[in-house]
Amino acid sequence: MLRLLVLAALLIAVTARAESATPAIKAVRSWHLAASDLPWTDTTPATHGLRLTLIIFQDTAWDPETTLAATKNMAPLLAQCGVRIVAAELRQLAAPTRFRYYRTPVSRELARLAPVPRPAIYFVEDTLNRPAFDAEAIGRANSGTRPELADTIWVAAGTRDLHVALAHELFHVLEDSGAHSDEANNLMRSETAPENTRLTDSQCARMRATAERNGLLTLLPN
């Protein structure tokens, strides 16, 4: 009997240790935007559709109103390429503090433990990576040592010109390229600014072709 009690105690201890080793990450709330909620200001019909996943965390500076408004304001910047956001889901996660910051090894763990559809934009409290960027895009070409983060964007609280920054980083992911442009007022200039919103036909064509090939954009019916 004593041996059985000892074995049972050991089993309980091992189980408890295993449970505590797996961080508690759970979705606590979600919001949805349909195509009808997102502005389409272009005069020509959209050719490609984009579905986005947006992630915020409890107990951070980010709120749903800010992130959803930035997503709506970003939509016209993609429209010039014939790309329409056909759906966007914002999920709020409850997670241990370390996951609320962008740090490559920890964020890789988060992506493994709580996978979401891609492309995905994570709104975090700050970045702990060095050098530090307000926002960082990880495509497939630059995710070789961090495959869990492919097709994701990480945005720190306080990022300026948020809708422009989101469109800029999303374009990096869709085009699967870190290239920047020297053209005046181009969205892909190295520094984002309110006036940097334009894209050329050739930029749009490259982005659409790559994103469609990678399954991030879908052709819309005529």
Describe each PLM feature range.
Residues 109-115, 127-149:
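Catalytic zinc-binding patch centered on the HExxH motif and its immediate surroundings
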Residues 15-17:
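Sec/Tat signal peptide C-region and signal peptidase I cleavage site
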Residues 66-73, 106, 162-166, 170, ...:
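Stable alpha-helical elements in mature extracytoplasmic
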Residues 148-167:
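Short pre-active-site segment immediately N-terminal to the catalytic Zn-binding motif
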Residues 170-185:
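Catalytic Zn2+-binding segment of zinc metalloproteases
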